[in-house]
Amino acid sequence: MIRIGHGFDVHKFGGVGPLTIGGEKIDYPQGFLAHSDGDVAIHALCDAILGALAMGDIGKHFPDTASEYENIDSRILLRHVVSLAKEQGYVLGNGDVTIVAQAPKMLPHIQAMRSNLASDLNCELSQINVKATTTEKLGFEGRKEGISSHAVVIMNKESMSKTNA
């Protein structure tokens, strides 16, 4: 069986940088206001995986009221979500992440983000895409108040993924 999921996340800028996006530290004067490290790309990806498997959302699994998740590296959260999917017999077919940001520029960091995500997802680099866009200076992203991210995933039943490999 194939399952499709979509995720979305947004965080406002605040405090001091760097930013962490896609598991990559990006030099920027501001950081994110968030309970965890605020990695919008990974949070959207976690939500997409959880949504595909009808397992709720990131807030259900990692509530912002729980002190153990304060300032946590979101890659740890992603690896946990991947293990939950594996317990249900699912693996990533492919994933596509879109980062919406006026600044900083993402292009210099995209390949490192893809490598980080592929490692945490236990998949080939060709199974995960990361891209970035601006809002042409419109909205909160355009005013450089924060960053948002969307993610879409296809999750395959593990036995299906082995026969198609």
Swiss-Prot record:
Return the cofactor note field: Binds 1 divalent metal cation per subunit.
Q: Which reaction does it catalyse?
A: 4-CDP-2-C-methyl-D-erythritol 2-phosphate = 2-C-methyl-D-erythritol 2,4-cyclic diphosphate + CMP
Q: Which domain of life is it from?
A: Bacteria
Annotated EC: 4.6.1.12
- Residues at which a divalent metal cation binds: D9, H11, H43
Q: Which cofactor does it need?
A: a divalent metal cation
Any GO BP annotation: isopentenyl diphosphate biosynthetic process, methylerythritol 4-phosphate pathway
InterPro entries, sorted: MECDP_synthase, MECDP_synthase_CS, MECDP_synthase_sf
Name the protein family.
Belongs to the IspF family.
Assembly and binders: Homotrimer.
The name this protein carries in UniProt is: 2-C-methyl-D-erythritol 2,4-cyclodiphosphate synthase
Its source organism is Pseudoalteromonas translucida (strain TAC 125)
What is this protein's gene name? ispF
